[in-house]
């Protein structure tokens, strides 16, 4: 009886040792996984940043991937023109040439028939429309209605997109917009660590899903679009997009969920902001602004507005000004961010 008890005790100790070793191994593995959340309002550029991470740190996009997004390119291009044509009616803007009415009817008929193929006839009609003074005037007022940021890019490239031999480029892919629903994830290895980057849809209806991603987060990259200071939300056509972004940043930055988490702020679409700020004053969003109407001073003011919302004296907000469609710019910024996250992770592990 005593012999059996002794044998059982030894077996129990061996089992406990194996369990302890597995726990230590699991803890070591978990410390080597860096979980990043990409958060921000809808259309801020989160999905584009995620695509850039795949290009820069994973296997990029194959030829098949590029060919598969051709219908999305066509759809984005056609719907961009459709948005302008609808806005012309509501803003009561006349076409520069009467013949453009017939061209616009072809665009409406194509969408109504659910045939979003960029045929030669449709492409030529859209090119004529895009060069029409009335259409250009309507596009200039694009902050007054809803239209994708990529509209000008795709419409400028209509001759290339409508070529029979057209294959989308990586830049075309970066410019495409598909509303993010649910959770999208990219995994990549860097300097012995596994980065798990998660993008969740930013529209109000999607934010309830964010809670499922909050566990074991190492850092948050919050993305806000600089160029949307004079635009309203697609969801309600009423709320200012920049004010919505500030409100969302406030709630996330000061949430108890993220009290000990590194916070990175990307003020995105600086290229579009540079074009817009010369003709649309920042006071549209911030009536109290008294500074110069130039890119640098206005961006610094917007950055200050975000940083003022941080109520923790222990937390530093790491801010970067980005253009999500510029791979070189994103690489420079991401390298700095990831190096900072790695250094702080090693410090938390007691390795530096």
UniProtKB/Swiss-Prot annotation:
The keyword Nucleotide-binding applies. A lipid is attached at residue 2 (N-myristoyl glycine). Residues 195-204 are annotated as: G3 motif. SMART domains: G_alpha. One of its GO terms (cellular component) is cytoplasm. The keyword Zinc does not apply. Residues 35-48 are annotated as: G1 motif. Residues 172-180 are annotated as: G2 motif. A lipid is attached at residue 4 (S-palmitoyl cysteine). Mg(2+) binds at residues 47, 180. Belongs to the G-alpha family. G(i/o/t/z) subfamily. It holds the Pfam family G-alpha. GTP binds at residues 40-47, 174-180, 199-203, 268-271, 324. G proteins are composed of 3 units; alpha, beta and gamma. The alpha chain contains the guanine nucleotide binding site. Residues 32-352 form the G-alpha domain. SUPFAM superfamilies: P-loop containing nucleoside triphosphate hydrolases (SSF52540), Transducin (alpha subunit), insertion domain (SSF47895). Residues 264-271 are annotated as: G4 motif. InterPro entries: Gprotein_alpha_I, Gprotein_alpha_su, GproteinA_insert, P-loop_NTPase. GO terms for biological process: adenylate cyclase-modulating G protein-coupled receptor signaling pathway. Guanine nucleotide-binding proteins (G proteins) are involved as modulators or transducers in various transmembrane signaling systems. This is Guanine nucleotide-binding protein alpha-7 subunit. Keywords: GTP-binding, Lipoprotein, Magnesium, Metal-binding, Myristate, Nucleotide-binding, Palmitate, Transducer.
């Amino acid at each position: 009886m005593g012999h059996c008890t002794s044998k059982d005790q030894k077996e129990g100790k061996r089992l406990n040792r194996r369990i302890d070793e597995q726990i230590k191994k699991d803890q070591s593995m978990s410390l080597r996984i860096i979980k990043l959340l990409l958060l921000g309002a809808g259309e801020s550029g989160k999905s584009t940043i995620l695509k850039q991470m795949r290009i820069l740190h994973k296997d990029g996009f194959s030829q098949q991937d590029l060919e598969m997004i051709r219908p999305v390119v066509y759809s984005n291009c056609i719907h961009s023109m459709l948005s302008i044509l609808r806005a012309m009616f509501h803003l009561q803007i006349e076409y520069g040439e009467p013949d453009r009415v017939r061209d616009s009817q072809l665009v409406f008929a194509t969408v109504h028939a659910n045939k979003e193929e960029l045929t030669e006839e449709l492409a030529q009609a859209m090119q004529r429309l895009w060069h029409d003074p009335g259409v250009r005037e309507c596009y200039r007022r694009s902050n007054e209605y809803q239209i994708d940021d990529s509209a000008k890019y795709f419409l400028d490239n209509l001759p290339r997109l409508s070529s029979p031999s057209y294959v989308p480029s990586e830049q075309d892919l970066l410019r495409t917009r598909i509303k993010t629903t649910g959770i999208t994830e990219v995994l990549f290895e860097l300097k012995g660590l596994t980065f798990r980057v998660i993008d969740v849809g930013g529209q109000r209806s999607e934010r309830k899903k964010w809670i499922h991603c909050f566990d074991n987060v190492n850092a948050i990259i919050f993305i806000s679009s600089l160029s949307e200071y004079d635009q309203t939300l697609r969801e309600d056509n009423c709320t200012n997009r920049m004010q919505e972004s500030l409100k969302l940043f406030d709630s996330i930055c000061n949430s108890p969920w993220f009290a000990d988490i590194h916070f990175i702020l990307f003020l995105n679409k600086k290229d579009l902001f540079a074009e817009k700020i010369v003709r649309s004053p920042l006071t549209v969003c911030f009536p109290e602004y008294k500074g110069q109407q130039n890119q640098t001073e206005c961006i610094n003011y917007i950055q200050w507005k975000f940083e003022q919302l941080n109520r923790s004296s222990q937390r530093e907000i790491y801010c970067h000004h980005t253009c999500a469609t510029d791979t070189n710019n994103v690489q420079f910024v991401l390298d700095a961010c990831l190096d900072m996250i790695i250094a702080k992770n090693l410090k938390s592990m007691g390795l530096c």
